[in-house]
């Protein structure tokens, strides 16, 4: 009545009853955790039965028509079961099995875990090592805001959401500086409920009309949203056989040394790289951040882009006025050539590794991975370097149990 009278959207909470056990055809009373009287009382107010009675009372449908619809539904379900199953020769009397001819080919098992990346065909890519155009020095954190500004201006499909991103002059670090004022309908501050807004982002990504950029203020908070992040968003393409795109970008930051405690600092790379469906990128320079975020937003798979608080205040060369290029997919960057040792690293550990190599006088090859997940990592560059040096060191800040280096090794 509130909605009918123009009172606006209304939440209706309807309590319903699960009449049967978690699996199988038996009611809960058969297992002793419900009584038959309780089940009967709920059956008397079953919404399906009540709707049927209202339809008859209002002369919308007759009782005979409703019964006919019931029979049609039962017949359709029975027909489907007959087509899909057959008597199980090794089972109990009356048991059935899926027809062997209907089982999918084993080669189909990984179909749809990720897309084929055809959406990247023809993308304009740049590399700092070969860039010869006009350049300027920019702070890392300013570039984060600028490239998101460019994508928000370019497409109404891009929606940004997260805690405090609409205030504090661009969130806790300035990554969304000025964006809420320019795009008030698409830069959305959220409640402190990662499970809720991650799920919202996953839903609108699957819907196909939006490309959400969701921020987890700290990666440790992913555990609050673990079901949405790993069971829903990460697995959605596979669940639908690759037919449904999931253009979802998750931004988060490593905060080692920030003083916020062990619940606000983790490196989530190892966790995401051992979880199906996710692509993982990490930029160590402002130049690479532009290209990696643009690539992440172009890809129709869920992508987590990991940042680091230590990099936000650093500066680096970027193209003047160009925030539209991508970093080549699946390509690492060799930051220093060497013959004695291969160092595989990412984020702020790239510069730390370069500094350590110089201080120690070691002729090491430092490889900035950039693309971290199994399906995207540059195995060719890694392989060539290891063949040359025959020695490997993986440098990261992850915890031992969930470390990226442990997985990569």
Feature locations, PLM:
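Thiamine diphosphate
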Residues: 1-82, 86, 90-91, 101, 105-302, 306, 310-311, ...
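Terminal amphipathic helices with adjacent charged low-complexity linkers/tails
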Residues: 71, 75-125
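Low-complexity, intrinsically disordered regions enriched in charged/polar residues
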Residues: 45, 60-63, 67, 92, ...
């Amino acid at each position: 009545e509130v909605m009918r009278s123009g009172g606006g959207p209304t939440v209706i909470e309807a309590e319903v009853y699960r009449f049967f056990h978690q699996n199988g055809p038996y009611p809960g009373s058969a297992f002793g955790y419900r009584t038959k009287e309780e089940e009967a009382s709920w059956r008397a107010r079953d919404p399906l039965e009540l709707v049927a009675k209202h339809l008859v009372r209002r002369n919308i449908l007759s009782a005979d028509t409703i019964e006919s619809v019931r029979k049609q539904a039962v017949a359709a379900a029975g027909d489907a079961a007959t087509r899909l199953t057959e008597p199980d020769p090794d089972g109990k009397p009356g048991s059935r099995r899926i027809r062997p001819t209907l089982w999918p080919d084993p080669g189909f098992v990984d179909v749809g875990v990720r897309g084929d990346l055809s959406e990247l065909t023809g993308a304009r890519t740049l590399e700092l090592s070969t860039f010869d155009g006009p350049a300027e020095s920019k702070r890392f954190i300013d570039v984060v805001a600028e490239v998101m500004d460019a994508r928000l201006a370019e497409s109404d499909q891009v929606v940004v959401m997260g805690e405090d991103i609409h205030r504090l002059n661009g969130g806790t670090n300035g990554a969304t500086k000025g964006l809420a004022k320019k795009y008030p309908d698409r830069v959305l501050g959220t409640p402190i409920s990662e499970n809720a807004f991650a799920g919202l982002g996953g839903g609108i990504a699957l819907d196909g009309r939006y490309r959400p950029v969701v921020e987890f203020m700290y990666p440790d908070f992913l555990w609050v949203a673990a079901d949405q992040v790993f069971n829903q968003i990460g697995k959605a393409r596979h669940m639908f056989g690759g037919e449904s795109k999931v253009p979802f970008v998750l931004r988060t930051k490593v905060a080692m040394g920030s003083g916020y405690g062990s619940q606000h600092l983790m490196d989530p790379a190892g966790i995401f790289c051992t979880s199906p469906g996710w692509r993982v990128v990490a930029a160590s320079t402002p130049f690479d951040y532009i290209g990696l975020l643009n690539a992440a937003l172009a890809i129709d798979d869920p992508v987590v882009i990991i940042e680091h608080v230590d990099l936000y205040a650093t500066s680096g060369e970027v193209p003047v006025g160009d925030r539209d290029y991508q970093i080549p997919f699946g390509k690492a960057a060799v930051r220093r050539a060497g013959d004695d040792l291969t160092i595989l690293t990412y984020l702020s550990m790239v510069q730390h590794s370069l500094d350590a190599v110089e201080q120690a006088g070691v002729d090491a090859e430092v490889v900035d991975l950039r693309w971290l997940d199994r399906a995207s990592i540059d195995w060719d560059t890694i392989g060539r370097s290891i063949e040359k040096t025959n020695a490997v060191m993986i440098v990261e800040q992850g915890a031992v149990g969930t470390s990226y280096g442990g997985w990569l090794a």
